[in-house]
């Protein structure tokens, strides 16, 4: 029994970590797998929790909405009312099951726009604030950028039929229309930028631009799909609310339709499956809502989604095209990945000409030959996937792909990292230009140093011109260094505006949080979550390096694999040199005492269960860990306190049975402030 539970727990941990990783990647606009593959992982985790409820913990990703808000130049703001997600169904039988569980006289069907969620607050008819979804409770303040989107009025229009309320919080989706997407990419390439992979990435990246003039040029649009908090507004149905939004001058979807039976709902699903490219924007499903607000209130919500709405997700689209060649790319960690070069083909809202093939084992398994007609699919992900060949279309001219033995970027002999590893890597990690370029763009990202002027082309130019041989000298770059490049100089050879911006960015990046420095080092498995935990516990890189592997592994949220990876990274001399040179250049390697809360919870184990008003699961955990406490997912005799929110469930019952101290949210805040209640 115990061994079986341990196996199940390991299975849950693995699935949960994959879901967390890929969800964070999606919301940070760097997806690594398709939407369909993510949905499959998510459902496997849900099913495991349903079959074994003892595995579920409050911080499970199945209970989360969105992703944590990363620290950035945008201020964090709390939504007046939580922005929930939607549960999904994937076939007619699942939808019919939902319809039987939630019968209603009237449903509203609307397209699921593949864009970026936004929350608008109007007070006395004036736009007061605009924010991204974030984790559903806290988002980023993007008011300045929202004000340059033509679809978002600065002031609501007067309406006799629907008087403008004193306060109204409006939910919508920001997107780029399909026909505008090509124009945006064309302009971006003229300016020397890399084209966006799809309209969603373009919209998400644009809304988080620091330059409002750049946002204005991106042709962003918005459609409203709901109302959050309000004062002085009443409506009986969702449909009436949409009429009010329209009367106030806000855009609503022209594709929304009221239907009055389960059969009509299924008919709408079938219709849009056949006409998904008729919409002016990308869509990946149909949302079905109960129209009556009274019925919505009666059904309520789970921790992550309303019970009165569901999203029907369409399967990935599949098309055929010609496989012209198979080439390989080298990533940040040296992994060599084959990819397909194809005749351009339009699929799922954009034209694609490259698709992933993962590794040489996958190429053989799929049986594709250069020259084949191949089936590809794409469901909103950055790079589509080759499914396999259309064998009956072969004419004998096709040829087998031979995986290279040498790195295409530096000529080093390739090898698997370990025996039987499907992935082959270039071991020349320090000097391989492809790996260095990827590391430079990674450390320049928003989740690390946030060096806006260091993009892919800039990184490649710094390497090709001989200015950088590895990342160690990055913070020692001078104006004379940049004058040796093309990206950062004028035709006359003087430093251009981008070059000046890079020097300013680098100076600013020296004074950043320790966790961002840890992420920037490209240590395998060390992402923002682990980096934050290590920074909170050790406070300085010196203290972290002095700790042994076992001690690091005992850090909440870290574990043995990350600890071992950290130790192995510092075993490499040129890795240590990076840290030393950065420190000499003035990069902060420790968090100041002022940034670190008093360790008032040291030695305490705290369990948080149920939904809190002012804390998400992650922010409650971070509040505990940052004060020296241990945030646990299970209740035991060793638990010091159990913090109980709404819908707490079995953990509260167990805590009472064990006679543990139970705190409400106000008492939890007191505990965080003083260490006692």
Swiss-Prot record:
It is an enzyme of class 6 (ligase). GO terms for cellular component: cytosol. It comes from the Bacteria. PANTHER family: CHROMOSOME TRANSMISSION FIDELITY FACTOR 18 (PTHR23389), DNA LIGASE (PTHR23389:SF9). The keyword Amino-acid biosynthesis does not apply. This is DNA ligase. It comes from Corynebacterium diphtheriae (strain ATCC 700971 / NCTC 13129 / Biotype gravis). Its EC number is 6.5.1.2. It catalyses: NAD(+) + (deoxyribonucleotide)n-3'-hydroxyl + 5'-phospho-(deoxyribonucleotide)m = (deoxyribonucleotide)n+m + AMP + beta-nicotinamide D-nucleotide. Zn(2+) binds at residues 407, 410, 426, 432. DNA ligase that catalyzes the formation of phosphodiester linkages between 5'-phosphoryl and 3'-hydroxyl groups in double-stranded DNA using NAD as a coenzyme and as the energy source for the reaction. It is essential for DNA replication and repair of damaged DNA. Keywords: DNA damage, DNA repair, DNA replication, Ligase, Magnesium, Manganese, Metal-binding, NAD, Zinc. NCBIfam families: dnlj (TIGR00575), PRK07956.1 (NF005932). PROSITE patterns: BRCT, DNA_LIGASE_N1, DNA_LIGASE_N2. Its cofactor is Mg(2+); Mn(2+). One of its GO terms (molecular function) is metal ion binding. The active site is at residue 112. Belongs to the NAD-dependent DNA ligase family. LigA subfamily. Residues 596-677 form the BRCT domain.
């Amino acid at each position: 029994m115990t061994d079986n539970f341990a196996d199940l727990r390991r299975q849950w941990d693995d699935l949960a970590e994959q879901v967390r990783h890929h969800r964070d990647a999606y919301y940070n606009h760097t997806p690594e797998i398709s939407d369909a593959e993510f949905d499959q992982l998510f459902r496997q985790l849900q099913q495991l929790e349903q079959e074994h409820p003892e595995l579920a913990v409050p911080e499970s990703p199945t209970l989360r909405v969105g992703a944590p808000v990363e620290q950035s130049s945008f201020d964090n703001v709390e939504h007046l009312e939580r922005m929930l997600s939607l549960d999904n169904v994937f076939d007619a039988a699942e939808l019919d099951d939902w319809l039987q569980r939630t019968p209603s006289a009237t449903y509203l069907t609307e397209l699921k726009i593949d864009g970026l969620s936004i929350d608008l607050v109007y007070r006395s008819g004036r736009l007061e604030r605009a924010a991204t979804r974030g984790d559903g409770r806290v988002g980023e303040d993007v008011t300045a950028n929202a004000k340059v989107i033509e679809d978002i009025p600065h002031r609501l229009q007067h309406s006799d039929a629907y008087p403008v309320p004193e306060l109204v919080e409006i939910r919508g989706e920001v997107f780029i229309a399909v026909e505008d997407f090509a124009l945006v990419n064309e302009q971006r390439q003229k300016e020397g930028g890399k084209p966006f992979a799809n309209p969603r990435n373009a919209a998400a990246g644009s809304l988080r631009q620091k330059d409002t003039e750049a946002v204005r040029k991106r042709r962003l649009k918005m459609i409203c799909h709901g109302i959050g908090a309000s004062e002085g507004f009443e409506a009986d149905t969702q449909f009436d609310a949409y009429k009010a939004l329209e009367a106030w001058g806000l855009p609503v979807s022209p594709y929304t339709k009221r239907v009055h039976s389960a059969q009509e709902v299924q008919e709408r699903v079938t219709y849009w499956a056949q006409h998904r490219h008729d919409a002016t924007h990308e869509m990946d499903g149909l949302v079905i809502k109960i129209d009556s607000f009274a019925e919505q209130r009666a059904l309520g919500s789970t921790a992550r989604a309303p019970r009165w709405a569901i999203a029907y997700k369409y399967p990935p689209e599949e098309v055929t095209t010609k496989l012209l060649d198979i080439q390989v790319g080298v990533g940040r960690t040296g992994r060599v990945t084959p990819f397909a070069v194809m005749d351009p083909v339009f699929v799922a809202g954009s034209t694609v000409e490259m698709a992933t093939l993962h590794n040489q084992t996958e190429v053989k398994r799929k049986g594709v030959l250069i020259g084949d007609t191949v089936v590809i699919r794409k469901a909103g992900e950055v790079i589509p996937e080759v499914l396999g060949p259309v064998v009956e279309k072969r004419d004998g001219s096709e040829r087998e792909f031979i995986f290279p033995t040498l790195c295409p970027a530096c000529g080093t002999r390739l090898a698997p990292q370990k025996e039987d590893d499907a992935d082959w890597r270039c071991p020349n990690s320090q000097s391989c230009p492809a790996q260095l370029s990827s590391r430079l763009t990674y450390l320049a990202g928003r989740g690390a140093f946030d060096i806006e002027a260091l993009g892919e082309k800039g990184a490649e130019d710094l390497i090709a011109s001989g200015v950088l041989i590895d990342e160690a000298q990055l913070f020692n770059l001078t104006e004379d260094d940049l004058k040796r490049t093309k990206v950062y100089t004028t035709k006359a050879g003087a430093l251009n505006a981008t070059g000046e911006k890079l020097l300013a960015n680098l100076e600013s990046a020296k004074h950043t949080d320790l966790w961002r420095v840890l992420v920037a080092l490209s240590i395998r498995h060390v992402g923002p979550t682990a980096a934050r935990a290590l920074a909170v516990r050790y406070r300085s890189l010196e203290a972290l390096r002095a700790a042994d592997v076992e001690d690091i592994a005992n850090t909440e949220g870290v574990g043995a694999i990350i600890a071992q990876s950290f130790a192995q990274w510092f075993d490499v001399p040129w890795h240590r040199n990076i840290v030393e040179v950065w420190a000499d250049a003035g990069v902060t390697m420790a968090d100041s005492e002022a940034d670190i809360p008093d360790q008032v919870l040291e030695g305490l184990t705290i369990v948080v269960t149920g939904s809190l008003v002012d804390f998400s699961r992650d922010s409650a955990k971070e509040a505990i860990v940052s004060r020296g406490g241990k945030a646990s997912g299970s209740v035991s005799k060793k638990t010091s306190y159990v913090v109980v929110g709404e819908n707490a469930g079995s953990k509260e019952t167990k805590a009472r049975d064990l006679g543990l101290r139970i705190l409400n949210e106000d008492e939890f805040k007191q505990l965080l402030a003083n260490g006692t209640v």
